[in-house]
C-alpha cells in the first residue's frame, strides 16, 4: 500500500499531462517513482506492531513526494548507488510469484497475487496448492547480506509473532461505485 501511494503521489507531483503510456518520458517517471518508493520501503517498513518509528505520515505525504520528484533527473536514470548505497542490490525479478486481474462482463473484479517465495515454496502441499515460505522475506539481522543480495534493514528483522514485509498489493479502485482500475 505505501509503495503504491508513494508512486501515485510522485506521479501526481511530477505531472503526466500530455504523455502517452508508452512514451519514454512516461515510463521513466514511473520507473524512477517506483525505485524511490521501494527504497523507502526497504529503509523504513516492517511490521508496525514492532516498529513505532516508521515515518508513514511523511512517506505518504504529497510534500515528501514533491521532494522526491524534485531530486529526480527527468532525462536519465538515477544511479542505484546514489539512491541508497546502504541497501540497494540487483537481484532481478522473482520467478515464483503470479498475479492476475480479472473483470467479468458484469464488472465484477478480482485482483490476486500468489507467491511461493522460492521454488516449490515450503515444499508442503495442502488442499491442492503449495504453501509458501515467506519467512524468507524477513531480514536475518541488521546489516546482514543474504545469498540473494538482500541487505538487512532493522525494521524488517525477524522476531517471534512478527509479520514480514511484503510487496504484494493486489488493488481494485472504484469511483462512485464504478470500477476504475484493477491491478
Where are these regions (language model features)?
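Flexible, polar/acidic helix-loop-strand segments at domain edges
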Residues: 2
Amino acid at each position: 500500500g505505501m509503495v503504491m501511494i508513494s508512486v501515485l503521489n510522485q506521479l501526481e507531483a511530477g505531472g503526466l499531462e500530455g504523455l502517452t503510456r508508452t512514451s519514454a518520458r512516461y515510463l521513466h517517471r514511473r520507473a524512477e517513482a517506483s525505485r524511490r518508493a521501494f527504497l523507502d520501503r526497504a529503509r523504513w517498513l516492517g511490521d508496525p506492531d514492532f516498529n513505532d518509528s516508521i515515518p508513514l505520515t511523511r512517506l505518504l505525504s504529497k510534500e515528501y513526494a514533491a521532494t522526491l520528484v524534485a531530486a529526480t533527473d527527468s532525462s536519465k536514470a538515477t544511479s542505484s548507488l546514489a539512491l541508497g548505497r546502504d541497501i540497494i542490490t540487483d537481484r532481478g525479478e522473482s520467478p515464483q510469484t503470479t498475479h492476475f486481474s480479472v473483470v467479468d462482463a458484469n464488472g465484477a473484479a478480482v485482483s490476486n497475487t500468489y507467491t511461493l517465495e522460492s521454488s516449490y515454496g515450503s515444499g508442503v502441499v495442502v488442499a491442492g496448492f503449495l504453501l509458501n515460505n515467506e519467512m524468507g522475506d524477513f531480514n536475518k539481522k541488521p546489516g546482514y547480506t543474504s545469498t540473494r543480495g538482500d541487505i538487512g534493514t532493522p525494521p524488517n528483522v525477524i522476531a517471534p509473532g512478527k509479520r514480514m514485509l511484503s510487496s504484494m498489493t493486489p488493488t481494485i479502485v472504484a469511483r462512485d461505485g464504478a470500477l476504475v482500475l484493477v491491478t
